[in-house]
Amino acid sequence: MGLTTVERFASRCIEIGVRWLIAAALGMVMSVPLHAQSTEAPQTHWEQYKHRNVPPQPDQHLTDPALVGAIDLHVHHDPDSYPRAVDAFEVARAAQERGLRGIVLKNHWTETGGPAYLVRKYATPGFEVFGAVTLDTAVGGLNPQAVRYLADVAGGLGRIVWMPTHDSEHEVRYNNESRPFVRVSRDGALVSEANEVIAVVAEHDFTLATGHVAGDEALLILRAAKAAGVKRLIVTHPMFLPQYTYMSLDQLRASVDLGAYIEIVGRSLTKDGESKDKTLAAVRTLGAQHFFVSSDAGLVGELNQTDTLAIAAKALRAAGASEADLTIMFKDNPAYLVKLPTLGGGAAPHAR
């Protein structure tokens, strides 16, 4: 005896339901994060960096005499496209409270002359706050118009132009990532766009920083900038991490021979390790007059800017730096690099 229409319909529904349950169960099994079954690609270095999920580091309220009158030329802040610990108003107020003379706001993706104007006006009147621009992909890479815009922003507070940082070809290739990058050189020579940007930096009397390029590229940039008439040059933290600029002692010596100032980021001195050892050795060998100290702090889960600077000062002092050396590295050289008089009224020691 055959099945009725109703019975056939019921049987079909049961079959579909069983198939759905089996598929759902298989989906649940396949979603279990077992290494043997996972088909997801691991997060890249940059994705991990952008999606930090760590608790904030409390302010330790550290102080040091070197901070009084200091200028931090490398201050990260919110708003940003990945987690920062404090916003621009908060970091400026904290720096002012600890006795700093000023800061330079830095963002990898946009200019900060505008934020500097607002911070000065509404958060810290009388405190020196300056802006900058970094030539990463968000501003068009090696885009001379981005430099011109910084010069035109109300307040005239732009001071530093960074060559590409997180989007530099060097960093992207070092981390083996597949994302857009900014190339500054080809076959051992700067690309034409780099030379055009350098010319605009010279025209507007900005300070030029080398960014996260390879060591040999940094030297190409410094030589071209000096030839173009750029007056103030920074080698961006070349003793910090190899995915950024990592220079040999000979390359550092060549940089200072070109008149550049070498950045020490406080983050490299907060923990023992290769970066700290390399930094202290470079200062001992080349002399404090060629260096300046910035924080490069601001990531969620890490020390804040003022605590970082205080620890850096103590580390340098413990390694043999004199109080005069600390004044040069925390106060005089940074002042020169943002076109302010030194506390003593003269030029920075290296620039004399």
Predicted segment positions?
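Bacterial N-terminal signal peptides
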Residues: 17-31
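An N-terminally biased module of ancient metal coordination in phosphate/nucleic-acid-related enzymes
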Residues: 39-127
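Divalent metal-dependent hydrolysis catalytic cores, especially in the metallo-beta-lactamase
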Residues: 72, 76, 90-113, 126-137, ...
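Acidic (Asp/Glu)-rich catalytic clusters
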Residues: 116-125, 149-156, 226, 252-257, ...
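Extended substrate/RNA-proximal surfaces in nucleic-acid metabolism proteins
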Residues: 126, 140-236
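Catalytic pocket-lining loop regions of alpha/beta-barrel enzymes
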Residues: 199, 204-274, 292
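Short acidic/histidine-rich active-site segments
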Residues: 288-305
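Mid-to-C-terminal alpha-helical segments outside catalytic/metal-binding sites
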Residues: 308-352
